[in-house]
Swiss-Prot record:
Belongs to the eIF-1A family. Residues 6-80 form the S1-like domain. InterPro entries: NA-bd_OB-fold, RNA-binding_domain_S1_IF1, TIF_eIF-1A, TIF_eIF-1A_CS. This is Translation initiation factor 1A 2. Disulfide bonds: none annotated. It comes from Haloquadratum walsbyi (strain DSM 16790 / HBSQ001).
Length: 94
């Protein structure tokens, strides 16, 4: 983080990833997300994140849609509120 601006270097999506917002928590390790391309997908929370990173409605996440089933995606990263605000001010998400 730079001292004068307060800007942090954040994880940005790779070629097959995109930003999404959690719309609904369906229980277990599944959430409904609204992706940056306008699609609603079923997001799967992987085991490495399940108990360490709590994902709630309204959270900004990074998802990777499945190649063989486009209506589903894996959640790869959850951004904190400060990180999500930085992404909004820089114009990466709406």
């Amino acid at each position: 983080m730079s001292e004068e601006s307060g800007r942090r270097n954040l994880r940005m999506p790779s070629d097959d990833e995109m930003f999404a917002v959690v719309v609904e928590h369906n229980g277990g390790n599944h959430v409904r997300v609204r992706c940056q391309d306008g699609e609603n997908r079923m997001g799967r929370i992987p085991g490495r994140m399940k108990y360490r990173t709590w994902i709630n409605e309204g959270d900004v996440v990074l998802v990777e849609p499945w190649a063989w089933q486009d209506e589903k995606a894996n959640i790869e990263w959850r951004y904190s509120e400060q990180d999500a605000e930085q992404l909004r001010t820089e114009g990466h998400i709406k």
